């Protein structure tokens, strides 16, 4: 079982603001900052971390689970408004399974960030 993940970002402050806006529709908030790391999570437990001032190669793909499709759409809209690039608008991805509803964006550092809901509408 995965407990947490950390990714490198080039500009800590810009990326921190980006992820605060992008993850809010999924219930995430900035929980703590420790020694150059910002930890985001739900319910007081950070499970997604960013560290600034680092080279961001290789790029990563991180998917955040949502309990409903509206939050996936809100994530996508917030990400685009925060400067992300579209990498797949909200919609069904039947190649994974019939209820796989996801949205994909490329963040400020080129990482593929996704929100996904596995529940039927």
Label each PLM-derived region with a short phrase.
Residues 1-16, 62, 119-121:
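N-terminal beta-strand motif that seeds the catalytic metal site of vicinal oxygen chelate
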Residues 112:
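Glycine-rich acetyl-CoA-binding "A-motif" of GNAT/NAT acetyltransferases
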Residues 11-13, 64-109:
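Vicinal oxygen chelate
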Residues 27-29, 49, 86-90:
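A short linear hydrophobic-aromatic micro-motif
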Residues 1, 55-58, 97:
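Short glycine-enriched loop/turn motifs at secondary-structure junctions
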Residues 7-47:
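Core segments of cupin and vicinal oxygen chelate
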Residues 40-81:
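Long, continuous compositionally biased terminal/linker segments
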């Amino acid at each position: 079982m995965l407990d947490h993940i950390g990714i490198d970002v080039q500009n800590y402050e810009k990326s921190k603001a980006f992820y605060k806006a992008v993850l809010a529709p999924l219930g995430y908030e900035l929980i703590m900052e420790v020694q150059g790391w910002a930890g985001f999570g739900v319910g007081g437990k950070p499970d997604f971390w960013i560290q600034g001032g680092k080279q961001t190669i290789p790029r990563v793909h991180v998917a955040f689970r949502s309990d409903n499709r509206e939050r996936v759409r809100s994530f996508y809209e917030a990400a685009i408004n925060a400067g992300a690039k579209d990498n797949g608008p909200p919609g069904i991805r039947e190649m994974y399974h019939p209820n796989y509803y996801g949205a994909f964006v490329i963040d400020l550092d080129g990482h593929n960030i996704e929100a996904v809901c596995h529940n039927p509408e």
